[in-house]
């Protein structure tokens, strides 16, 4: 898909972070922009930002929607058609949440919340929008589906189980949709970034009341530590530009990178993830050490060229604590166990 002007884009999770960056980028290309989010205050602020970015107010539609509720998501799709005269030509599903902790400490609520937003909302959107898009645009004009996944789709850790499982499923869904949509003149792209400058570090604040029973240690101090990491993530508009290039060039997997060397090291590491699970633990540890050294060397070279990834500073110990640990009252958990250990 290369011709964006005058067409319609819908971005789930478009009120902040990566989603808002995508809305800005494609709105700047002349698209009519619809964004969906669960928070009205965030939507109101996003509309102001989009207008300030140069997108005409008449080309902006902000919809408060629970993306995990199929009836509500269908209502959202209906509103887009009623407002702009058709379904989106470009569907970008970006809404996501995360919660970190030992997977053996996880509760049903931890899985239901993370999988519900990160996977089920994507399924909902595909099943609601794609039939409409095919009927309206197949063999007539360009259309495309995209989803924001994560590097976590390729490499799970003991503290990211629900999130990594959801993102791995999303990736495979998009591979399937790319194959399925080819006969209709369309395709799919899955964006797999690392750290993004976004509000996902605040996600726990907006966790539904009926899914609050977590097995992880979560409080304002742990969230502050997480926010410190996301504060130095890739700029959402820059990430949106990377996604646009991937869509224009029909890339199925989009891996944002800072330098070619970092990208090459990243790809080799991903290939090793699959290969390593067939090896002994000692062999895996040896390869992991080599990969860390290679990544460190690539990062040092990037720093010399002025293209290094930004560093971050942890908050002070007085007002923060490590995230990714289990609740203290779970007596089957090793109390010293930390994220990905």
Name these PLM-found stretches.
Residues 29, 155, 176-186:
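Active-site-adjacent segment of SDR/Rossmann-fold oxidoreductases
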Residues 40-41, 64-75, 108:
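The beta1-alpha1 cofactor-binding region of Rossmann-like NAD(H)/NADP(H)-dependent oxidoreductases
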Residues 2-34:
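Canonical Rossmann dinucleotide-binding motif of NAD(H)/NADP(H)-dependent dehydrogenases/reductases
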Residues 179-259:
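SDR active-site lid
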Residues 126, 166:
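Active-site helix of classical SDR
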Residues 150:
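Residue(s) in the substrate-gating loop at a strand-loop-helix junction
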Residues 102-103, 107-115:
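Substrate-binding pocket helix/loop in short-chain dehydrogenase/reductase
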């Amino acid at each position: 898909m290369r011709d964006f002007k005058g067409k319609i884009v819908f971005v789930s999770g478009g009120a902040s972070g990566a989603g808002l960056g995508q809305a800005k980028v494609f709105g700047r290309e002349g698209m009519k922009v619809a964004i969906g989010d669960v928070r009205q205050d965030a939507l109101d602020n996003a509309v102001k930002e989009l207008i300030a970015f140069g997108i005409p107010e008449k080309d902006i539609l902000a919809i408060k929607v629970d993306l995990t509720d199929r009836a509500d998501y269908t209502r959202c799709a209906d509103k887009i058609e009623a407002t702009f005269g058709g379904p989106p030509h470009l569907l970008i599903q970006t809404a996501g949440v995360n919660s970190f902790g030992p997977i053996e400490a996880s509760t049903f609520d931890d899985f239901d919340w993370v999988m519900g937003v990160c996977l089920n909302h994507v399924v909902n959107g595909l099943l609601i929008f794609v039939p409409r898009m095919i009927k309206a645009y197949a063999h007539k004009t360009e259309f495309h589906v995209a989803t924001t996944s994560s590097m976590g789709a390729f490499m799970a850790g003991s503290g990211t189980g629900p999130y990594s499982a959801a993102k791995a499923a999303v990736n495979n869904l998009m591979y399937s949709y790319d194959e399925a949509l080819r006969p209709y003149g369309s395709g799919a792209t899955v964006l797999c970034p690392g750290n993004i400058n976004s509000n996902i570090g605040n996600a726990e604040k907006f966790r539904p009341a009926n899914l609050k029973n977590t097995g992880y240690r979560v409080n304002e101090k742990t969230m502050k530590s997480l926010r410190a990491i996301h504060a130095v993530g890739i700029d959402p508009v820059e990430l949106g530009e990377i996604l646009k290039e991937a869509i224009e060039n029909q890339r199925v997997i989009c891996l944002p990178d800072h330098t070619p060397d970092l990208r090459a090291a990243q790809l080799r590491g991903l290939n090793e993830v699959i290969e390593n699970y067939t090896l002994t633990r000692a062999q895996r540890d040896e390869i992991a050490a080599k990969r860390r050294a290679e990544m460190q060397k690539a990062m040092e070279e990037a720093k010399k060229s002025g293209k290094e990834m930004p560093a971050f500073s942890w908050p002070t110990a007085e007002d923060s604590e490590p995230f990714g640990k289990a609740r203290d009252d779970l007596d089957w958990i090793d109390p010293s166990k930390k994220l990905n250990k």
